[in-house]
């Protein structure tokens, strides 16, 4: 058995019938059901404890064998119809519906809609979408309701012109985050500046910014929430460092061949100290004078799902172009070197390099990749998703085909989605999942 959560449409129907009978008995004393405003029948309702009836016990007695999930298991693999330049939306939907903990949240009916007009709730529509994609229906799904709600809540994405998949991802997470209020009732967020909805629990990380005064070495620290990390590429207008010569080793599928830039290289650049220069002097809170300073970004808190965005589309005063530089990325990623606790520090004036000991809590596994083919003016989005633990599939709108790991790692890469291998057991947080579960 794969030890994953199971969604069974027959059991779901039995649960609805039992729940209906229970509600009739509780109608005079309970007000719980009347508070539910979700427009989808059976969605977001609180099920009572299932007590088996005599016929059900007889059926269970006649069917004692457990079902074993076959390697050809295809539930969840369903194409999406392109409604007119909507590949940017389809590829993100495939990545989100194959995000393990988000999938389990929606398929377990955890959403409690509190919007005055539930038909405008994007979370309700995503719940319906998850149910459609995991229904076992092999025919492509038409996500017209989702597109309509996106146009309503993110008007800058309205219309049939080409859009950016990364921009859609951030807009979708923002709307889902706003519509999730009510799902975290009674829970206390670990950070008072954040809510504790499923979007924050899965996607929100903490980005630490340290500004160091060059005169007194005083440090000003701020921590901001983030849903993704955008990374500069070689060949862009921003400066990039040359590759270190002689690095020819390979780690978990990430190439280190001279001349090839890796995801790790991009993360090193993202977290290296940056001199702000004389034109950007700031008033130091320690010495109370305007001084030059350095700025360094590191991760204070890692999200459950880490999304990396390569800045392939460059818009400057001189030109608009797409950067096609190949970036090697691994199947497994260790974020320990890029944590605030691992950054370079000075002790008695001497630079101390971090000791990057293995930390399983900071290790991630790749589960989705979004790619863009074509030019800045005319292109097409597709995605690779991991399914049934170690199988990969290419999602090209309505067409889904089997893919190899080599196909995935050789792809250009625009958005990379990594899932934590080990989840820290925290109260009222998302359930712990073993790596085998996704």
From Swiss-Prot:
Gene coding for it: Usp27x
Q: Which GO terms describe its cellular component?
A: cytosol; nucleus
What name has this protein been given in UniProt?
Ubiquitin carboxyl-terminal hydrolase 27
Q: Which reaction does it catalyse?
A: Thiol-dependent hydrolysis of ester, thioester, amide, peptide and isopeptide bonds formed by the C-terminal Gly of ubiquitin (a 76-residue protein attached to proteins as an intracellular targeting signal)
Q: How does it assemble?
A: Interacts with phosphorylated BCL2L11 isoform BIMEL; this interaction leads to BCL2L11 deubiquitination and stabilization.
Q: Where is the active site?
A: 87 (nucleophile), 380 (proton acceptor)
The USP domain covers 78-421
- Listed InterPro entries: Papain-like_cys_pep_sf, Peptidase_C19_UCH, Ub_carboxyl-term_hydrolase, USP_CS, USP_dom
Q: Which family does it belong to?
A: Belongs to the peptidase C19 family.
Q: Where in the cell is it found?
A: Cytoplasm, Cytosol; Nucleus
Q: Which organism encodes this protein?
A: Mus musculus (Mouse)
Give the enzyme class.
hydrolase
List, in alphabetical order, the GO biological process terms annotated in this UniProt record. Answer: defense response to virus; innate immune response; positive regulation of apoptotic process; positive regulation of type I interferon-mediated signaling pathway; protein deubiquitination; protein K48-linked deubiquitination; protein K63-linked deubiquitination; protein stabilization
List keywords of the entry alphabetically. Answer: Cytoplasm, Hydrolase, Immunity, Innate immunity, Nucleus, Protease, Thiol protease, Ubl conjugation pathway
